[in-house]
Amino acid sequence: MSRDKELEKTLVKNADKNSITNAENTEAAAPIIPWASPGSTTAPVAEPAAKSAAERAELAASSVATAEKAAKEEVAEETTKELAKPARRSFFDRIPGMRSGALWAHLLFILVALYAFDYVTHAAADDIYVYRLGAVSLADGPDGYQLYTFRTRGLPFTYPPFAALLFYPLAFLTEPQSMLLITAIICALSYWCAYLLYSYARSRSWRLPLQKHLGHWGMVSLIAALIWMCGPWRLTTHFGQINAIILALILADFMRPATRVPRGVLLGIAAGIKLTPLAFGLLLLMRKDWKGIATLGASFAATVGIGFLVIREESLTFWFHAVHDTSRVGWFSYFDNVSIMGTLTHAGLQHHLTATALSVVQVALTLLIVLVTAVLLVPLIRARALMAQLALTAFMMLQISPISWSHHNTWYPLMLAAVVMEIFPLMYQRVSSFVFTLAVILATAALVGMYISPFWIVLAFSPHFNADQILMVPEGSLGLMAGTMPYQLMYLFILVTFFVYLANRQLVERAAHAADAELAEAKYSR
């Protein structure tokens, strides 16, 4: 600013000097006319000279203004250039996906992964050892272990023969190597699941917290770390379970376009590994995807056929004997059983009801959750709320199975996304404050409890038992019932949502049609 003022003063001084000099020169050059009177000697010339001086002064002032304007424009241009210069980037900013904000998210995921790999090298992981020994039994033949009779760490092989064939490569690995392999797979799938969730959210124009600061890959790393730290994924890693693989197969089948390969192929393979994914046939049925249902049946039948073709004796044993023996999986009242049967036995109802009466209650609650799920799928399908469709069907699957351990619920991230971003916006647009508050309390308590896991909840509500004594917590106690309370609260939340839908059916249907039209328009505009 000081430079501008000095320039301005200099221009004004020069202009004043020029105008004075021009005036003096004009007066000196005025001619003297001999025959004119003395009083009028300079009169005829003075008026034009004064006029000329005024014009020149005006011209000088105009040039000063022009110079000032040019100087200001030059300064403004220099300032703009300075501002337009890109800020100096740090080393991490030059790496794709490593913005300074995202760096912390990447580091968090790396720390979670390092902790997981360090943990599994020092802690027991029973399930992966069962898978490995199942593969060893096939490799050793009739003279070695028998697939459905051996036990390792007290646990038998409970999966179909097709699963044992897929586990066959584990026979060439040691127990620690197999554990590290399954942990690496879980690590990759947690990141892939986070990528799918974030991409799905962006395609629906959802704004997520910290999205502006972390960027795309920073958000993916943060979501992946949070997924891996939740109760179901922690325990899946602890046991070396295949639940993340089952999730990946089903997600890949439903999130891909069903073009050349019809939907249902991967779902059938998942059911061939573990029977419970057959429950997703209800989703195909409510979509009226007859081709998908046929493909699911054919794919599942192919896995059964491969089992009979390769290991006939083991297949006969499983399909005609082992599949009916639920005691091979565990006992119903185990603290980690989150199914309907687990809820009933945790409450100790088996001691107050006959076996028949207990079965009637279980069947009634099973039919209720199946009916409610089928009804709620209608508006969710119409609104193309895919996360909610998958999450609701997965919850039904966990509930109707006689035994569902909490680590089977690797669907938790989808449940959280579905409740917050699809079910509430679609179903709870115009409800009373009481109903809305009730739904928020039920959903929040359920989702927070699922994240923690039954193990820690049981210990929190059982002050006289420690971790080594958790199996001694008695049936019917508050501590044992509290462990699976989050799943009971989610069941109640779904029932409340069901009645809200029935009471506001037309409004929900209009909202579903609007959501469908908006997604169709967005897809067309792309």
Regions inferred by a protein language model and the residue ranges of each:
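Membrane-interface alpha helices of multi-pass inner-membrane proteins
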Residues: 262-285, 393-400
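Aromatic-enriched
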Residues: 420-526
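Small-residue packing motifs within transmembrane alpha-helices
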Residues: 260, 264-266, 303, 435, ...
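Hydrophobic transmembrane alpha-helices
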Residues: 174, 189, 274-277, 415
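Hydrophobic/aromatic-rich transmembrane helices and adjacent perimembrane loops
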Residues: 405-422
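Perimembrane helix-loop-helix junctions
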Residues: 278-304, 422-427
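Short, intrinsically disordered terminal tails adjacent to the first/last structured region
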Residues: 1-91, 504-526
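Primarily membrane-embedded glycan-assembly and transfer machineries that use lipid-linked glycans
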Residues: 82-262, 290-407, 474-483, 503-526
